[in-house]
């Protein structure tokens, strides 16, 4: 009997860089140059958006897991379009009564494209040390007794 699982099947379609991020109260598996439909964002088309709530980041050499988020990791997104999802029908009825109610809902979505995933270092802090100012206090004079 042969093993049908190959090591190449376990890879992520040849992409060695991906990230799991949190947006709109959900977690998404993001890969570079792919489209994703997420809940409506308040942004115009062609706008750039940065996600900083990265839960996991995998690159060629390592996997970084955040506690809860990966520090200094970013995902750059570009808004492609705004659209509406398929209609979901909700049908409510009360048995033995003539009460029926049919409603529909269409979720507002934003289609985004992942431009880059990066684990950048934060901007270097200035090398100047903070100087502490010491106040000189006068010693308390002894109380005079008259």
Swiss-Prot record:
The keyword Chaperone does not apply. Residues 115-146 are annotated as: Disordered. GO terms for molecular function: rRNA binding; structural constituent of ribosome. Residues 128-146 have a biased composition (Basic and acidic residues). It comes from the Bacteria. GO terms for biological process: translation. InterPro entries: bL21-like, bL21-like_sf, Ribosomal_bL21, Ribosomal_bL21_CS. Keywords: Ribonucleoprotein, Ribosomal protein, RNA-binding, rRNA-binding. GO terms for cellular component: cytoplasm; ribonucleoprotein complex; ribosome. PANTHER family: 50S RIBOSOMAL PROTEIN L21, LARGE RIBOSOMAL SUBUNIT PROTEIN BL21M. Belongs to the bacterial ribosomal protein bL21 family. This protein binds to 23S rRNA in the presence of protein L20. Part of the 50S ribosomal subunit. Contacts protein L20. This is Large ribosomal subunit protein bL21. The gene is rplU.
């Amino acid at each position: 009997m042969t093993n049908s699982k190959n090591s190449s099947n376990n890879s992520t379609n040849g992409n060695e860089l991906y990230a799991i991020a949190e947006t709109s109260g959900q977690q998404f598996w993001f890969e570079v140059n792919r489209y994703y439909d997420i809940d409506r964002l308040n942004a115009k088309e062609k706008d750039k958006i940065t996600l900083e709530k990265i839960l996991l980041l995998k690159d060629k050499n390592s996997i970084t897991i955040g506690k809860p988020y990966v520090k200094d990791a970013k995902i750059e997104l570009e808004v492609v379009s705004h659209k509406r999802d398929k209609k979901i029908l909700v049908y409510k009825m009360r048995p033995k009564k003539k009460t029926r109610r049919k409603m529909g809902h269409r979720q507002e979505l934003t289609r985004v494209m992942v431009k880059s995933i990066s684990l950048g270092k934060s901007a270097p802090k200035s090398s100047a040390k903070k100087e502490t100012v010491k106040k000189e206090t006068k010693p308390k004079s002894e109380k005079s007794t008259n």
